[in-house]
Amino acid sequence: MRTLWIVAVCLMGVEGHLTQFGDMINKKTGTFGLLSYVYYGCYCGLGGKGKPQDATDRCCFVHDCCYGTVNGCDPKLSTYSYSFQNGDIVCGDDDPCLRAVCECDRVAAICFGENMNTYDTKYMLHSLFDCMEESEKC
């Protein structure tokens, strides 16, 4: 519980994109958004290496790969526009870079929702020492 409190305090100052991504995750999973995924497995959170631990972690791996294809803005800092329409996430930017970032986040949030049955608390706050296998290519 103390660890979740520390993570929550660290995220309180987060503006823009991470807040938006967390909102998408919350809507698609009914969880606490980023708090549920920030240090999950080998790929959720900052960085990533090794082999994804399960389908949920693979969502983060694919998300990292998606960010790697974005050109023209910083995916982790860019603020984009989106809405929820009939339960679907709709990205609304005309700017191609912002739209691409939104699409990466949209696909990841949907992936989390579709793979909630693989979410395993043993991978929360997962040590990167357990992620030493050779990383897959995007």
Swiss-Prot record:
Free-text comment on the cofactor: Binds 1 Ca(2+) ion.
CDD domains in the record: PLA2c
GO BP: arachidonate secretion; lipid catabolic process; phospholipid metabolic process
Active site: H63, D105
Keyword Nucleotide-binding: no
A Pfam family of this chain: Phospholip_A2_1
Cofactor: Ca(2+)
EC main group: hydrolase
Disulphide bridges, residue numbers: C42-C131, C44-C60, C59-C111, C65-C138, C66-C104, C73-C97, C91-C102
Secretion signal span: 1-16
Top-level lineage group: Eukaryota
Cellular component aspect of the GO annotation: extracellular region
InterPro entries listed in its UniProt record: PLipase_A2, PLipase_A2_Asp_AS, PLipase_A2_dom, PLipase_A2_dom_sf, PLipase_A2_His_AS
Sites where the protein binds Ca(2+): Y43, G45, G47, D64
Organ and tissue specificity: Expressed by the venom gland.
Keywords, sorted A to Z: Calcium, Disulfide bond, Hydrolase, Lipid degradation, Lipid metabolism, Metal-binding, Secreted, Signal, Toxin
SMART domains membership: PA2c
GO terms of molecular function: calcium ion binding; calcium-dependent phospholipase A2 activity; phospholipid binding; toxin activity
Quaternary structure annotation from Swiss-Prot or TrEMBL: Does not form a complex.
Family: Belongs to the phospholipase A2 family. Group II subfamily. D49 sub-subfamily.
Role noted for this protein: Snake venom phospholipase A2 (PLA2) that is not toxic by itself, but the synergistical mixture of a basic and this acidic protein is lethal. PLA2 catalyzes the calcium-dependent hydrolysis of the 2-acyl groups in 3-sn-phosphoglycerides.
Protein's name according to its UniProt entry: Acidic phospholipase A2 VP7
Organism: Daboia palaestinae (Palestine viper)
